[in-house]
């Protein structure tokens, strides 16, 4: 198979979808890999390293898209990339289609086989290709929150861990999954007072076990969320429903109850956000805005700021799936691997992931049916 890896063009997105080790794995399996010039530089990987591993460097993204049967990316294509799609092409990347009607339409119009990292799901309901970036985003959310709590950043001037004789910051984490757990690890490590809310009592019990009395766990409901948000110095939104828009769990009234200079980091922004006052996606160049005196951070590609770590963490997990697709063809690969079948979001002009179809009021065709049509 002909594999194409274009350079990421999202604001300050420095990750790349393949490493030299990945190139070598494809080449040894009999495939050809084409990489856009400079695609790896943001992750400190040179074109020369790719060439040494067996890749061919192409000058432009257009050449990569024109040549490749399967495009492997990190982030969802932006509008300027839609025109590069080749009918029937395989696209393997984070898609986050639920809040992206234009991208969804473009994939359907060009009959793209869209396989989304974030909906590849194992039998135990875990999301293996979302996990590494969720771990990084969760950890970074606390670092970022601590930064924006500083006075020169517009925050209330609170040190997350406090000092002897002065109480630490209140960190409230809504959602106790992979993102929330990793956020809690860093917040606890920095000495903050941490509250985690989740709808799953078994998950709360697990969090109690691993953190002990270092965190407070609460059932996630509107009453408990409102009470926790009011006292939060740092609020982190970590809610995920695989493939679907994130539910708005924190209302505008709740945000209004927060003290001026408090900080919100919504890690769920790439699925539409879980905070009602998060009304826009921000960028690494311009990451925050203020609303009701509260600093809002809504960058959709948080791990892109630590690109080298993120690239290697991501590709460790995506490469085996990408090789399955290349070795067997997408159809056989998804038939043989139920986890990969869950990743299939679009096929032959049809939406094959129910949450995406619901988000855009489009007809839903089960993936198994679409494969046989």
Swiss-Prot record:
Its main location: cytoplasm. This is Alanine dehydrogenase. One of its GO terms (biological process) is L-alanine catabolic process. Gene3D superfamilies: NAD(P)-binding Rossmann-like Domain. Catalyzes the reversible reductive amination of pyruvate to L-alanine. This enzyme is a key factor in the assimilation of L-alanine as an energy source through the tricarboxylic acid cycle. The gene is ald. Its EC number is 1.4.1.1. One of its GO terms (molecular function) is alanine dehydrogenase activity. PANTHER family: ALANINE DEHYDROGENASE.
